[in-house]
């Protein structure tokens, strides 16, 4: 079992009951499912070949963002922003407290695991031909994971909102929706499909966008994980009202990983923030290193999903 230095968690005091937003047992309705069908059913290759490198020299990140904007525009034609916002406000099932779940692990001076569920990635291609998001998430929960991350981006990761809904039904852990969130429409959708936290990537958002999306998510009782890749992005992220800071060890343009990114940046994060190291964590030794650097949790997917039994791999990573 991996232990870590304790960080101050005063910022994660439980929310007042009155602040909980009313939500229903079925967070996603038919309109959202219908909107999701507008996504192109034939996503581009994710095998890292020519289709993942060209497009007028644009990076994989830029291509995914362009695709996401087009997808959201199409889905808004089916379910306009005003309508999906109204539906999100009507959800009555409480969120599960993503940040608080990590707080409990940190209080025990352990490094928590956010175990990821995804079918594919641009760098690795299809990870599991037998992909069953619900069963994978359940195996993670049994292995001792603190939270689950679900990739819902369709064009390069072959994910969908249906994956997240299936995971929510299968397990009781808090869920991070991992996607390229650029528009308020996606935040409302996240609440409808059952997400407890959303990922916001500093590299793809302008300052006013970031502030708007954080406020919207918080207003819907979801936590926000702000993802950074370098010191400049970290300094910007620390100015916002979000206590979850994710340090991504993957260069989103080259797709290479290096946990030295976390080792360099994590010590710069104030103790009242909770730090998550993302990507490139493969062994319990890696877990120990980032824990010693000040991380409260790690987000791991690919190294687990490559194993025959992802749950057993998660247990080994945690040192159980």
Where are these regions (language model features)?
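Active-site mouth loops of central-metabolism enzymes
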Residues: 117-132, 174-181, 225-227, 277
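C-terminal helical cap(s) of enzyme catalytic domains, especially alpha/beta-barrels
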Residues: 7-12, 265-268, 306-320
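Conserved, mostly hydrophobic/aromatic
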Residues: 64, 115, 140, 190, ...
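Alpha-helix-loop-beta-strand connector modules within alpha/beta enzyme cores
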Residues: 158-180, 211-225, 260-274, 317-320
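Glycine-rich phosphate-binding active-site loops on the catalytic face of alpha/beta enzymes
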Residues: 189-208, 247-254, 295-313
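Glycine-enriched alpha-helix->loop->beta-strand junction motifs that scaffold or abut catalytic
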Residues: 144-145, 170-173, 192-198, 218-222, ...
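An N-cap/entry alpha-helix motif that binds or orients negatively charged groups
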Residues: 3-30, 34-128
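Catalytic cores of alpha/beta
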Residues: 182-193, 232-240, 281-298
């Amino acid at each position: 079992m991996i232990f870590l230095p304790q960080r101050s968690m005063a910022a994660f005091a439980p929310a007042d009951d009155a602040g909980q937003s009313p939500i229903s047992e079925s967070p996603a309705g038919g309109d959202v499912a219908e909107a999701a069908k507008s996504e192109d059913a034939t996503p581009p290759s994710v095998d890292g070949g020519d289709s993942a490198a060209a497009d007028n020299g644009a990076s994989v990140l830029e291509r995914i963002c362009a695709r996401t904007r087009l997808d959201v525009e199409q889905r808004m034609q089916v379910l306009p922003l005003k309508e999906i916002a109204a539906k999100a406000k009507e959800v009555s099932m409480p969120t599960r407290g993503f940040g608080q779940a990590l707080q409990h692990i940190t209080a025990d001076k352990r490094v928590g695991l956010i175990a990821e569920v995804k079918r594919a990635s641009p760098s690795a291609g299809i990870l599991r031909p037998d992909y069953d998001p619900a069963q994978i998430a359940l195996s993670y929960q049994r292995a001792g994971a603190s939270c689950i991350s679900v990739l819902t981006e369709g064009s390069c990761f072959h994910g969908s909102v249906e994956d997240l809904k299936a995971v929510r039904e299968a397990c009781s852990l808090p869920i991070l929706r991992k996607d390229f969130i650029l528009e308020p429409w996606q935040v409302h959708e996240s609440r409808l499909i059952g997400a407890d936290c959303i990922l916001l990537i500093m590299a793809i958002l302008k300052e006013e966008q970031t502030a708007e999306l954080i406020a919207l998510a918080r207003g819907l009782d979801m936590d926000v994980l702000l993802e950074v890749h370098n010191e400049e992005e970290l300094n910007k992220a620390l100015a916002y009202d979000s206590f979850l800071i994710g340090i991504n060890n993957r260069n989103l343009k080259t797709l290479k990983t290096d946990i030295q990114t976390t080792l360099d940046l994590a010590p710069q994060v104030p103790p009242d923030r909770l730090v998550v190291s993302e990507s490139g964590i493969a062994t319990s030794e890696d877990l120990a290193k980032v824990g010693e650097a000040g991380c409260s949790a790690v987000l791991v997917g690919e190294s687990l999903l490559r194993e025959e039994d992802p749950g057993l791999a998660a247990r080994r990573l945690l040192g159980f």
